Regions:
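A short acidic/basic microdomain associated with nuclease active sites
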Residues: 18-34
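A short, glycine/Asx- and small/polar-enriched loop/turn
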Residues: 35-39
């Protein structure tokens, strides 16, 4: 269940921060809640750094930050292995069978040319969302602060000290150095309690299904 909420957050961040529209997502490919789709957690297409870009996203929510990064990179690596061409072709084919409503006719035609092999003029980007538990967040709530800005400043300092960039870099160098030549854009969300957060998101989206 965590994966579904992660996919929703991934979609929000990619469209909100990178301005790359979603072309299809795994949730929409399922015929019923028990179906399991072995693919990316979201496909996006748009302009990034001035070039046409295909985004293949991953969303992970883990208790441990390092585990979340490792699993996200492992999932991303599937699109650059021995059978990556076939896998990527499958992603595009399935996505075109369930395009997002926000795609214009022109973009749908362009995407069609991508998976038919008529055009390869695009770059690939991997937007990656990792939600993780941070035990220190509870402590921040017990300290007195003069105002909200002081709390924000302290949280920002704490996240900087977590050194997320180094954690990603170390994981890449140890097991996935070949991924360094590709665009990888990480979005991190520290959580006090992952399961509680997931339930809150579920309650906000589907209030009538929440257990009390």
């Amino acid at each position: 269940m965590d994966g579904k909420r992660g996919e929703l957050i991934l979609f929000t961040m990619v469209e909100g921060f990178l301005d790359i529209p979603m072309m299809s997502h795994k949730l929409g490919w399922k015929q019923n809640p028990t179906d399991q789709i072995k693919g990316s957690d979201g496909l996006f297409f748009g302009e990034y750094e001035g070039s046409p870009t295909l985004g293949i996203g991953e969303a992970k929510m883990y208790t441990d930050l390092d585990d979340g990064i490792e699993e996200a990179l492992d999932s991303t690596d599937r699109f650059h292995g021995e059978d990556s061409q076939l896998r990527n072709q499958h992603e595009l084919t399935v996505a075109m069978g369930n395009p997002s409503d926000n795609l214009s006719k022109e973009k749908i035609e362009l995407l069609s040319s991508l998976f038919t092999g008529e055009s390869q003029d695009y770059q690939m980007l991997h937007p990656i969302f990792v939600g993780y538990e941070d035990d220190d967040l509870e402590e921040f709530q017990t300290k007195p602060y003069e105002d909200d800005q002081e709390l924000v400043d302290q949280l920002q300092k704490h996240i900087e000290e977590t050194d997320l960039l180094s954690k990603v870099t170390d994981s890449l160098e140890e097991d996935y150095s070949h991924l360094r030549k590709h665009w990888l854009t990480f979005f991190f969300l520290p959580l006090e309690d992952k399961d509680h957060f997931v339930e809150n998101v579920k309650a906000a989206i589907y209030p009538w299904t929440t257990n009390h």
